């Protein structure tokens, strides 16, 4: 199988990521994070960014094979250390208010067999060192977009019955192009219409200002409090310079932050989570007074426990996102083993940091003010999927009255 018009569609995709995604403007600095396997796409993205007037495009290459060898064999003190030159680059990008474009294509099993303690130590070090970048991103001080490209090992994981590696890659590219509306006659207009539909749902929820949400489904009975003056966001965002951008491509979600002090009950995952090169399945999380008091998993439990119990702020939630079961990604019936796609197939929660923009005025608040407003602060932000066609969600008003939001996995407001 050879995907028809692949080069033409890859060019359209690159243009979408640079224009609709990070929305490059003349004089912008762009930081592109991408795998070495995706050099063809990287070249197109760099070309498009400069064509729109970018002042500089900095490419940050990654390689799963090299990273795996490092995690397996490097001395532990090196794994726990973030070199000064990487911190200096981060400071440079912050100074330039660089737009960040991250293209994900990693093998979901890249670090399978690496000791979870080594992966956890590295993630903790990176989280602490790059905290200023995380804060700038999560408060939309800069434009940022997360997208995907069809890596060979990832494609083989998603399509194990493909007749060849080439066919698996083609099948995955086809899904990426489809969900990112590349095949539409006018992709830019298609994205605007899609964003408008999501914005309409966000407006309804913002006007309601529910006190809490109640989730029920097989394996789930969870109540999440919502902060005062919380803000539901959808596809588009605005950076500190007043420029629009799309944080995720694809996206199907409407999201906010729960009050991290008010989570009660239990919730079960409905799709695998790919985290730190490991697949985690069958997650069940129990909350009391906002805090995770127990977490189990059928596969990858040790990795999950390391995430939750060894990272500051990881015992509470930072995001709750609503995605209907009727979304195109869900209806494809494909498990992508990639959070960007799987989270846009279904309702999900995030362990760790909340986005500052999830409360009114949050982008200008200090860390202490955000925490006082009910927004969790952490060095990590990890989404896991909880939705299904059996999930019901109610909005609870301050007087205790309830309004159905989801029934059988779909919007009813």
Swiss-Prot record:
InterPro entries: M29_Exopeptidase (IPR052170), M29_N-terminal (IPR035097), Peptidase_M29 (IPR000787). PANTHER family: AMINOPEPTIDASE (PTHR34448), AMINOPEPTIDASE AMPS (PTHR34448:SF3). GO terms for biological process: proteolysis. A divalent metal cation 2 binds at residues 319, 343, 381, 383. It comes from Streptococcus thermophilus. This is Aminopeptidase PepS. Its EC number is 3.4.11.-. Its cofactor is Co(2+); Zn(2+); Mg(2+). Binds 2 divalent metal cations per subunit. Can use cobalt, zinc, and possibly also magnesium ions. Exhibits a high specificity towards peptides possessing arginine or aromatic amino acids at the N-terminus. Could be involved both in bacterial growth by supplying amino acids.
């Amino acid at each position: 199988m050879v995907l028809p018009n692949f080069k033409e569609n890859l060019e359209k995709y690159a243009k979408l990521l640079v224009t609709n995604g990070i929305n490059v403007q003349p004089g912008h600095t762009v930081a592109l994070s991408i795998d070495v396997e995706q050099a063809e796409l990287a070249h197109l993205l760099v070309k498009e960014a400069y064509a729109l007037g970018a002042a500089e495009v900095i490419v940050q290459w990654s390689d799963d094979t090299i990273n795996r060898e490092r995690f397996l064999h490097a001395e532990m003190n090196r794994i726990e250390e973030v070199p000064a030159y990487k911190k200096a680059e981060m400071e440079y990008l912050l100074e330039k208010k660089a737009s960040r474009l991250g293209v994900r294509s990693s093998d979901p099993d890249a670090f399978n067999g690496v000791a979870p303690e080594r992966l956890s130590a590295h993630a903790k070090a990176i989280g602490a060192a790059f905290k200023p970048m995380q804060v700038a991103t999560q408060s939309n001080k800069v434009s940022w977009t997360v997208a995907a490209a069809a890596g060979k090992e990832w494609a083989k994981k998603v399509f194990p019955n493909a007749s060849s590696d080439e066919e698996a890659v083609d099948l995955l590219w086809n899904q990426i192009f489809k969900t990112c509306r590349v095949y539409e006659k006018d992709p830019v207009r298609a994205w605007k219409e899609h964003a408008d539909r999501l914005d309409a749902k966000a407006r309804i929820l913002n006007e309601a200002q529910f006190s809490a949400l109640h989730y029920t489904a097989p394996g789930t009975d969870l109540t999440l409090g919502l902060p005062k003056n919380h803000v539901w966001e959808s596809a588009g965002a605005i950076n500190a310079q007043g420029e629009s951008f799309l944080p995720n491509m694809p996206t199907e979600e409407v999201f906010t932050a729960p009050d991290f002090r008010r989570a009660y009950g239990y919730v079960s995952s409905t799709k695998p989570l790919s985290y730190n090169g490991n697949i985690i399945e069958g997650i069940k999380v129990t909350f009391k007074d906002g805090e995770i008091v127990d977490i189990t998993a059928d596969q990858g439990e040790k990795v999950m426990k390391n995430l939750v119990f060894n990272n500051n702020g990881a015992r509470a939630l930072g995001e709750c996102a609503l995605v209907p079961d009727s979304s195109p990604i869900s209806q494809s019936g494909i498990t992508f083993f990639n959070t960007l796609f799987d989270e846009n197939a279904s309702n999900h929660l995030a362990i760790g940091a909340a986005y500052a923009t999830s409360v009114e005025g949050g982008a200008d608040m200090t860390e202490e003010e955000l925490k006082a407003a009910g927004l969790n602060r952490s060095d990590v932000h990890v989404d896991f999927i909880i939705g299904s066609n059996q999930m019901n969600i109610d909005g609870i008003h301050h007087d205790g009255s309830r309004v159905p939001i989801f029934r059988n996995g779909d919007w009813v407001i």
